[in-house]
Amino acid sequence: MRTKLPMDFPISKMPHLPSLPVSLSFLLFFLMLVRYWKNSKGQGKPPPGPRPLPILGNLHQLADGLPHHAVTKLCRKYGPVLKLKLGQLDVVVISSPEVAKEVLKTNEINFAQRPEVYAVEIMSYDHSSIVFSPYGDYWREMRKISVLELLSNRRVLSFRSIREDEVWNLVEFLSSSDERTINLSEKIFSMTNDIISRAAFGRKCNDQHNFTVLLEEIMKIGAGFAIADLYPSLTFLRPLTGVKPALMRIQNKMDKILEDIVTEHRIKRKAAANSNIKFEEEDLVDTLLNYAEANKDEFHLTLDQVKAVTLDIFSAGSETSATSMEWAMSELLKNPRVMKKAQEEVRQACKGKSKIREADIQKLDYLKLVIKETFRLHAPGPFTPRESRERCEIGGYTIPAKAKVLINLHAMGRDPTIWTDPDCFQPERFQGSSVDFKGNHFELIPFGGGRRICPGISFATANIELGLAQMLYHFDWKLPNGKKLEDLDMSENFGMTARRKENLQVIATTHIPFQK
């Protein structure tokens, strides 16, 4: 039986109930807490990082200076696993060898994918190159071709005479410079381009200057920090930024050069077949075409794919070798003690010779330490990019699927917890050390690591060793216009590689005359 309140029951004696707005506010707050808890639980433990702004994310924190320098500062603050929001992208930055090993080795299949970059999509013939193709059957086949056919140790050795010829051409030019100021950066890049051209195409490229200029433009815009990459869903922005027309202009010019090269090879091969002539020497384009012909029933290699791989070899091989030589010479000039020690070693080991051959390089232990130290301070690319295929745990943090992961080589090379006096150029730090740069020691991985490690390590190293040895053997070096060594500008540029901001201008004085 229900109890009724008497009509004269005073309202003041009724229990106090919250008002409707207060109740709704409390309910809304409670629901937000529940949602936050569910989202947090679903995300696991995200890596630490600065609070992002709407729309921009953390882009404003990379605007001051070079992106890899700004990211390294944030890594120092937040730790070896850093989370950033760059536009619409979730980016995780790894800056310790231990966590890099988790990404590149322990979980290498999950991180075998490279993130999509709009410029690369256009320039690599829709991701048909070895470097940028998606992880899968096509990539595995192309990787096999590169390791077994294109860039094997046997094939790299077969290009020895090409390397020696082109390095000697550089030495000849320097010998005739008569102590004038030389743009050494330009000459080094020209030399490496000639080496790669002859190895890849069988001759120097007829459009060498245009080809080099186009490569430089690709390196500048292919780093993955363009508006089209940071806001991938906003496709309407691409025409507005002018990136697409610029990319198409570069791609059309580059395609014309590559098309002519491949067509020339096909005509030459057809003529040889009609005359029953067997090639004594094959360049890399010949090797690709041979493979395509021999395996056409199992693996169809299109013309665009041949061009993509050819461009891959040329751009990666030339840029890596030249950038590393340029930085090595810069550091040697900046550090005369190291320069003197390296010169004394090569001049003693090759005493009495009018020129150095590649076989002499094996005696030059200190030169190899110089190259290691150059890779530590100046990795050809400041970041090694990967993408997570599935959600996983890395370094104690949850990495979502499709996250862009950057291995920060710039930060690891300058980490005081890894290296003593990390900002000093001291090749002796590697004396007696087993640390190499071939992907086995994650504190020094200038060529990456895991199954997507750069297949051209041997090729690049051979170019760098011979080029540096010859320049140190034959010449003494100084800066022009009486400039002091401490005034040498060591500023970097940012792109797919981290080249010097300013070209290296030097004066070379002949110490040991050269005879070809």
UniProtKB/Swiss-Prot annotation:
Pathway: Secondary metabolite biosynthesis; terpenoid biosynthesis. Keywords: Heme, Iron, Membrane, Metal-binding, Monooxygenase, Oxidoreductase, Transmembrane, Transmembrane helix. Belongs to the cytochrome P450 family. Heme binds at C454. GO terms for cellular component: membrane. Its main location: membrane. InterPro entries: Cyt_P450, Cyt_P450_CS, Cyt_P450_E_grp-I, Cyt_P450_sf. It catalyses: dihydroniloticin + 2 reduced [NADPH--hemoprotein reductase] + 2 O2 = melianol + 2 oxidized [NADPH--hemoprotein reductase] + 3 H2O + 2 H(+). PANTHER family: CYTOCHROME P450 71D11-LIKE, CYTOCHROME P450 FAMILY 71 PROTEIN. One of its GO terms (molecular function) is monooxygenase activity. Monooxygenase involved in the biosynthesis of quassinoids triterpene natural products such as ailanthone, chaparrinone, glaucarubinone and amarolide, allelopathic degraded triterpene lactones inhibiting the growth of other plants, and possessing antimalarial, antifeedant, insecticidal, anti-inflammatory and anticancer activities. Catalyzes the conversion of dihydroniloticin to the protolimonoid melianol. This is Melianol synthase CYP71BQ17. The gene is CYP71BQ17. Mainly expressed in roots and, to a lesser extent, in stems and old leaves. It comes from the Eukaryota.
